[in-house]
Amino acid sequence: VESAYNEREKTKSGSYVNEYVNNFLEKEPIPGIEVEYTLVNKLAPNIPVEAVNQVMQQLITDNNQVVLLAGPEKEGAKYPTKEEIAALLKQMKSFDLKPYEDKVSNEPLISEDIKGGKIVSEKAGEIYGTTKLVLSNGVTVYVKPTDFKADQIVMKGVSFGGTSVFPNEEIINISQLNGVALVGGIGNFSKVDLGKALAGKRANVGAGIGNTTETVSGSCAPKDFETMMQLTYLTFTSPRKDNEAFESYKNRLKAELQNADANPMTAFSDTITSVLYGHHPRAIRMKENMVD
C-alpha cells in the first residue's frame, strides 16, 4: 500500500480497470489510494495477533477443508487412499502440537566495519543524460535519473566472461551455479531468515551467470538504498554454506530431471539439440545421474 501511495501519480491504467471491475462485480468501494493508505496506517497497528488467530480459528472448521494430492501417474507409484487421508486428518486432532515460534534476529546484515571506497572521477556521460562515475575498485557506474517511478531505484551490473571462460568438462557444474550459489542465504542469514530480516523493507538483489556475462541486479525504495547495497556486498563476498539446503536443492533437481526423462518430448528435444550442435558438451542437457 505504501508503494502504491508513493507511486500514485504513476498509477497504471490496468490498476484503475481492476478497481472498476471489482466495484461493479463485488461492490468493492473505490475510496482512492490516499484514503486506503490513511486507513491502513490507522487500523493495522491496532489489530493484535490474538484477534487474527481468533478469526483464523473461526474460518478453519472440520467441514470446510480440502486436501489435494498430486503426483506422477506411473507404474510403481503408491498414494494413500481417500479413507487413509481422512483417517490421518482425524488423527491429527490428537497430536500435541505446539504453536510455531518465529525467531527473528535483530542482527544487522553486515556486522563488521567495512572500509568504503571512493569516487575517483565523475563526469557527464556521452549519451542518455547519464553521469559517469569511476570507483576506486575499478567499477564504472552510470547514473541515470528518470521520472518513470517516484519510489524506485533500479540497479544492474554486467561484466564479461560468463560460462564461456570455463572448460567444457566443468560446464555441467557451472550450469547449476545460478541455482546453487545463494541457496543457503548470505552472510549469517539463511534464505528464510533473510526474508524475515528484510520484513518492512523493499530491497532485493540477484546475481547470475550467462554464456558470456556475469550480472548483478536489484531494486529498492529510496529509503532502502543502503540495504540494497549491503545485499549486493554480501552477494559478492559472503554466500552462506548450508549443507541441508544444498541437499534439498539436489533432491528437488533430481526429481525434476527424473520427471523430465519420463516425458517423450524430452528425448525428441535432446535428439534435435544433439544434431544441431554436433553433440557438443556445452549443449548437453543435465541428467539425473549427473547430479551427484
Whereabouts are the PLM-identified features?
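Proteolytic maturation boundary segments
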Residues: 18, 22-160, 164-167
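M16 family metallopeptidases and their MPP-like homologs
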Residues: 1-46, 64-72, 142-144, 149-182, ...
